[in-house]
Amino acid sequence: MAGRNIKNGENNKIAGSSLHLEKNPTTPPEAEATLKKLGLVASVAAGVQFGWALQLSLLTPYVQLLGIPHTWAAYIWLCGPISGMIVQPLVGYYSDRCTSRFGRRRPFIAAGAALVAVAVGLIGFAADIGAASGDPTGNVAKPRAIAVFVVGFWILDVANNTLQGPCRALLADMAAGSQTKTRYANAFFSFFMALGNIGGYAAGSYSRLYTVFPFTKTAACDVYCANLKSCFFISITLLIVLTILALSVVKERQITIDEIQEEEDLKNRNNSSGCARLPFFGQLIGALKDLPKPMLILLLVTALNWIAWFPFLLFDTDWMGKEVYGGTVGEGKLYDQGVHAGALGLMINSVVLGVMSLSIEGLARMVGGAKRLWGIVNIILAVCLAMTVLVTKSAEHFRDSHHIMGSAVPPPPPAGVKGGALAIFAVLGIPLAITFSIPFALASIFSASSGSGQGLSLGVLNLAIVVPQMFVSVTSGPWDAMFGGGNLPAFVVGAVAATASAVLSFTLLPSPPPEAKIGGSMGGH
């Protein structure tokens, strides 16, 4: 995802590695953007995250309603990390070299938004398309709807990576080398992600949203499906409006092939291996080989951090429906009630995330630096994931007591259990704000000395996010099945990974260097 080439002709030693800083002669003075314009570009994240919030809160239960068992549901999510690993570096590479009259990043952002619209249509109407193609009715697997859903889901993840990577790259371009603006840009991005989350989870938690769009409920698409479809209508409208607004106000100047060649020549001279760069994957491999030690440690801490996060992000509402509420997919109302309670928890989480996003600068100064803050919140993450075990056992004890008293259908969990679960969601907003901001800001400072471009460098940090996601997607289903099919085993592994990430953040991750002018590529203005 995020990363930058640190340039300026000086050599700064950090943990035994030199960061080459030299001014980029092709950066126009007008590229230095105001905070207002940085915020406008960052606002696109609200549209992206609105859709992601719907994915995280509603799609795992939805695929199970289509007939995909829990063990296999995690494999559906492989498309996200796989597309992130391939698409984002690819888009970054070509956006670095784009000579469009609209600029380097804006064409990719616009294309990503258009692809999101196509994907949302396929996902929302998967059940209808499946029924029209001959899927059976009732509580059975619907293979054609599943196929349409999977295609739409893959397109959606490709679209999000096509959109989000260049959006972060444009923010880095606009920061024009200022560490302060870089930190603010990432904080703005995190803040608008929180706003998008709040909107998405609020929409997902309202069980009668389909009444606003009555045509969404059909014979093949029940109330839950119609609500999901309605949420996606709102999502794509928000994304298109924000994208058009940002791309209309913030301009990029067209660059020429000669300027690209000049930048490539400069990078080749700074390349530690002394060899010319190979296209795309060759550059990505070269970037990984030439990474300075601070960036390698950052990638390791980030990878452990995402091993901790991804099980909960993937199965949080499913955990509420099954373990906390004791429901079963497609049977009775308890599971649906739990999913909607989980969406409420995610909305509360996003409110905390938004407040924290605007407080990161002050908190980092208060605790002694960004790396120390990241270590502290990783401990908070580990404690919260461990507390899911306590909440689950309390809910099970409550249900067992009702079975003993002869109750055929247990009621929803008591207020104390539900409050404990929602408290976990709320507190997790604190470390999530840091996860969405600090790694990208540090990557901008610990930029790779591989000579890769702004967009391609984003793919380097992204690898530390998508590879753990692939690992969790492949292993969480079988791992959970070994312990009875619940979500807790993956959450416990996440708690261990968060603890390891905190230890490495405290002990190995170096502090960023003093403010230095980080050469930005030809930016927007």
From Swiss-Prot:
Outline which residue ranges sit on the Cytoplasmic face. 1-37, 509-525
> This protein is called what?
Sucrose transport protein
One GO MF annotation is: sucrose:proton symporter activity
* Compartments in which it is found: Membrane
Report the protein's function. Answer: Responsible for the transport of sucrose into the cell, with the concomitant uptake of protons (symport system). Can also transport maltose at a lesser rate.
Q: Which domain of life is it from?
A: Eukaryota
GO biological process, alphabetically ordered: sucrose metabolic process
Listed under GO cellular component are: plasma membrane; vacuole
In terms of Pfam families, this protein maps to:
MFS_2
Query: What InterPro entries does the annotation carry?
Result: MFS_trans_sf (IPR036259), Suc_symporter_pln (IPR005989)
The membrane topology term of the UniProt record is: Multi-pass membrane protein
Membrane spanning segments where?
A: 38-58, 72-92, 107-127, 145-165, 184-204, 230-250, 295-315, 338-358, 373-393, 422-442, 455-475, 488-508
- Alphabetically list the UniProt keywords: Membrane, Sugar transport, Symport, Transmembrane, Transmembrane helix, Transport
The family line of this record is: Belongs to the glycoside-pentoside-hexuronide (GPH) cation symporter transporter (TC 2.A.2.4) family.
Organism expressing this protein natively: Spinacia oleracea
Q: In which pathway does it act?
A: Glycan biosynthesis; sucrose metabolism
